[in-house]
Amino acid sequence: MQFFGRLVNTLSSVTNLFSNPFRVKEISVADYTSHERVREEGQLILFQNASNRTWDCILVSPRNPHSGFRLFQLESEADALVNFQQFSSQLPPFYESSVQVLHVEVLQHLSDLIRSHPSWTVTHLAVELGIRECFHHSRIISCANSTENEEGCTPLHLACRKGDSEILVELVQYCHAQMDVTDNKGETAFHYAVQGDNSQVLQLLGKNASAGLNQVNKQGLTPLHLACQMGKQEMVRVLLLCNARCNVMGPSGFPIHTAMKFSQKGCAEMIISMDSSQIHSKDPRYGASPLHWAKNAEMARMLLKRGCDVDSTSAAGNTALHVAVMRNRFDCVMVLLTYGANAGTPGEHGNTPLHLAISKDNMEMIKALIVFGAEVDTPNDFGETPAFMASKISKLITRKALLSLLRTVGADHRFPLIQGVPTDQSSAATPHPIFSLDKTQPPAISLNNLELQDLMPISRARKPAFILSSMRDEKRIHDHLLCLDGGGVKGLVIIQLLIAIEKASGVATKDLFDWVAGTSTGGILALAILHSKSMAYMRGVYFRMKDEVFRGSRPYESGPLEEFLKREFGEHTKMTDVKKPKVMLTGTLSDRQPAELHLFRNYDAPEVIREPRFNQNINLKPPTQPADQLVWRAARSSGAAPTYFRPNGRFLDGGLLANNPTLDAMTEIHEYNQDMIRKGQGNKVKKLSIVVSLGTGRSPQVPVTCVDVFRPSNPWELAKTVFGAKELGKMVVDCCTDPDGRAVDRARAWSEMVGIQYFRLNPQLGSDIMLDEVNDAVLVNALWETEVYIYEHREEFQKLVQMLLSP
């Protein structure tokens, strides 16, 4: 039995030896009385264990000389001596200063630290061990600022990286640790604290003024730069409260630029909230604003909402739009454009964003830039237009696609005649064709068919500029009516058409028309015209608004839409606050059966002498008078599309009864004039001479397979009935809200019968676009199709502009 016992003990010893020779084990000192003492230092003794042929290091407990701990058991005497020397050098300050060290778990941790970090001082080890009493030992205090280790870091660096605020206090208060000492990477304790997770450590460091707060490491980063790079928003806040400087140059500029480069929105917002001037700061290297560094739509939108200059240029002359196009960031491009970025600004070498988009072969981006006003024939410093650059693209398929795209809006890819370009470079060029009535005298400006500048020479020829600028003071002898269809976000099509008319005429829409009628989205635009909001501004507003309003699933929350309307028109603005032009919005009174059409007016409703359709019902409240009607509520009521938004009180969307408000508007004008005559004010009545009706785009006609609804007799017929009911329901809704077809035919016929010039402008769209579409690419494509429509119908636009400008 003794043999087997010794065998088990031997196997156990061997197993422990091979498993972990440095496993700390509590022992009795008496067990080693028969072993030879090889070396002794203080409480540490190295024994030679002859029976096991090992060298054991024993730490005798200072509190009890009969007990101790075996720190290691090694087979090699040389290894044992080396480790004994290291242990005897590092251990004494710990067991001399704290009884907590005299536990197996603590000693094991300390042993592992000593072996893992042989270059560390006792103070470094004390930081990782985390026992506060140890920092009162004189030897640990003496090494508080030591950098003698592989990283060159001080114990304070380690405490900050570890995030141990209690140890940090011990180092600063008792050991007088310096906070501006740098490691091998040039980093101070502040850099280490930023990389940790405990902001309290950073707060403690920041209580005392130190150059380390703004120290730049070898990568050129201050602690604030590093916090922004890592997305540590709370660390950024603490650093700023500790007066960290925001104007220290780093590899990517100032800290705000670093936050933008790494798309750390929270950090950028924190810097701007603490120092609003940082939103306009330009980095010394590139002269770029924070907006130039925006890599996604969210970051760009955040800056622009806080007032960042959208057209700020870098040292090279490029705007943020140039950079976004060069980087193929379509989402950024759309945000910049919708916040008013100039799509035609020349940048480095005179290249506009469109020049750069052509070179990137990005069709969506090209369309977006042209839709937002980029000129296809503006030359750069080398005399190259975007269209000419498209003709030079090496890839045949790409070249053909680009040229085909640009030709649809009248772009000329030939090299233009430009002043300042050498004659040998432009001798083969021919003058660009001008789509105007007088082709013998092309204007001295570059052509932009998309913005209808080909029409501007005509309007200038007919009216000098000083007359155009004073048109609002002229007395027209006839009235002009503008009618705007409903269609949700497709109101962008109306905006694009109005921009074209304004560009061609040189006159704001408000001054071209005496009456404006609108339904739903058309009603919102009618109010925008009334309140002198530019259509370019409204285009951006619509792109921004859709993301705020159309969130989640239908029906959408009404709050965001109402907040948008209040923001744009004012919370307390009344309909009658602005009197010209006269505006009417359609709404549907749904508190009665059958429902009735209601017009929200900025003038008193005309008195109509005719028998009422229904007997008066005392349970039905009369509508609010125009003088008391809030503008935003009128817009909300006109746009309360069923299934998209909840009703606004008793009002539903006006599109249910008048999605194309032309005939209703003409009827209203007739009744208004008749009322004026009855009241003896016939001299104020002016005959309606022009009606302009703008649509939100015609959806393509598609075949319908079945609208049959019947009692099914089998599962197949049930499926057929369900499908038929769905198609029939869609057809009923489309028929009720159809703004084209017979509605247009009736309006045109009535106008012709009474001698009114009628213009219906409504582009054919390539696909059916929903009222709540939020995809930028889809909407840009719809506006592109609108631009193509404008170019193809330029003669009709010419005629319209001529008539609108006539007195």
UniProtKB/Swiss-Prot annotation:
Segments carrying motif DGA/G: 653-655
Gene3D superfamilies: Ankyrin repeat-containing domain (1.25.40.20), Cytosolic phospholipase A2 catalytic domain (3.40.1090.10)
Region (Calmodulin-binding (IQ motif)): 749-760
ANK repeats: 120-147, 151-181, 185-215, 219-248, 251-281, 286-312, 316-345, 349-378, 382-403
MF (Gene Ontology): 1-alkyl-2-acetylglycerophosphocholine esterase activity; calcium-independent phospholipase A2 activity; identical protein binding; long-chain fatty acyl-CoA hydrolase activity; lysophospholipase activity; serine hydrolase activity
Assigned EC number: 3.1.1.4, 3.1.1.5, 3.1.2.2
Transmembrane annotation, as ranges: 481-501, 512-532
Motif (GXGXXG): 486-491
Disulfide bonding pattern of the chain: none
Subcellular locations according to the entry: Cytoplasm; Cell membrane; Mitochondrion; Cell projection, Pseudopodium
EC class: hydrolase
UniProt keyword terms in alphabetical order: ANK repeat, Cell membrane, Cell projection, Cytoplasm, Hydrolase, Lipid metabolism, Membrane, Mitochondrion, Phospholipid metabolism, Repeat, Transmembrane, Transmembrane helix
Annotated catalysed reactions: a 1,2-diacyl-sn-glycero-3-phosphocholine + H2O = a 1-acyl-sn-glycero-3-phosphocholine + a fatty acid + H(+); a 1-O-alkyl-2-acyl-sn-glycero-3-phosphocholine + H2O = a 1-O-alkyl-sn-glycero-3-phosphocholine + a fatty acid + H(+); 1,2-dihexadecanoyl-sn-glycero-3-phosphocholine + H2O = 1-hexadecanoyl-sn-glycero-3-phosphocholine + hexadecanoate + H(+); 1-hexadecanoyl-2-(9Z-octadecenoyl)-sn-glycero-3-phosphocholine + H2O = 1-hexadecanoyl-sn-glycero-3-phosphocholine + (9Z)-octadecenoate + H(+)
Active site: 520 (nucleophile), 653 (proton acceptor)
Coarse class of the protein's main subcellular location: cytoplasm
Region (Calmodulin-binding (1-9-14 motif)) location: 678-687
Effect of residue 520 to A: Complete loss of phospholipase A2 activity
Comment text on domains: Has two putative calmodulin binding domains, the 1-9-14 and IQ motifs. One calmodulin molecule interacts with PLA2G6 dimer, likely through 1-9-14 motif on each monomer. Binds calmodulin in a calcium-dependent way.
Assembly and interaction partners: Homodimer formed by catalytic domains tightly interacting through a large hydrophobic interface. The contact area involves 3 alpha helices, several loops and a part of the beta sheet from each monomer. Both active sites of the dimer are in close proximity adopting an open conformation that provide sufficient space for phospholipid access while favoring cooperativity in deacylation-reacylation reactions. Each monomer has 9 ankyrin repeats stacked side-by-side in an elongated structure oriented outwards from the catalytic core.
PANTHER family: 85_88 KDA CALCIUM-INDEPENDENT PHOSPHOLIPASE A2 (PTHR24139:SF34), CALCIUM-INDEPENDENT PHOSPHOLIPASE A2 (PTHR24139)
Function: Calcium-independent phospholipase involved in phospholipid remodeling with implications in cellular membrane homeostasis, mitochondrial integrity and signal transduction. Hydrolyzes the ester bond of the fatty acyl group attached at sn-1 or sn-2 position of phospholipids (phospholipase A1 and A2 activity respectively), producing lysophospholipids that are used in deacylation-reacylation cycles.
Protein name: 85/88 kDa calcium-independent phospholipase A2
Native source organism of the sequence: Cricetulus griseus (Chinese hamster)
The encoding gene: PLA2G6
